[in-house]
Amino acid sequence: MIQKFDIDGNPNLGVSILAKDNVAIVSPGLQDSYLKSIKETLNVPIIKTPICGSNLAGALMAGNSNGLLISPYVFSHELDVLREHDINVEIMPDKLTAIGNIIVANDNGALVNPSLSDEAKRIIKNTLEVEVVETSIAGLDIVGSLVAATNRGALVHPDASEEELDLVEDVLGVPAEIGTVNRGVKLVGACIIANSNGVIVGNKTTGPELARIDQVFNLFEGSL
């Protein structure tokens, strides 16, 4: 299933909301209509909490079904909320705090910013229980903003090379294709909310973009 909406006029949904196959994390002030759409499309429990005192869960977190990684600026009461819901969450040690911009992961692997420390990569590997590979894509290190990935497929920045697409496929273990969202926006990871059950994109997303998203994430086979 694919849904389209903007949050208060903002189509860059992947910055605001984090979604995996077992949970979606949203702002506590998110309107009921959005919550209903998220629940229907992604078919996961929803946790309402600020992250680092903000409404930017997607930018400040990354992870997969095994665990979540979070900015070191997280508040203790926010961690308590996540752990009360039995979420395995670990704090990242580095100064690169926009975790969602520098890590993209599914249940098969993780691609990360080459600037991450060895300690950070160890935490990622142990928390997510996957192989961790450093890379840039299309000349950029913000891999979490450049790739939207689930356990079905990965949509990648349109300037990615064939070699980079092959790497995404090898590490994440899913088919990868280039594409855009929101009428030509290349930072697909920052704009898409997705898990294996569905995808949510901004209202500006065009018909051809939706067709590519449907194909890449293999949504025609239905929910898991």
UniProtKB/Swiss-Prot annotation:
Keywords noted in UniProt: Initiation factor, Protein biosynthesis
InterPro entries: eIF6
A Gene Ontology biological process term: cytosolic ribosome assembly
One annotated GO molecular function: ribosome binding
Highest taxon of the lineage: Archaea
Family as reported in the entry's similarity comment: Belongs to the eIF-6 family.
Function comment: Binds to the 50S ribosomal subunit and prevents its association with the 30S ribosomal subunit to form the 70S initiation complex.
Protein name, UniProt field: Translation initiation factor 6
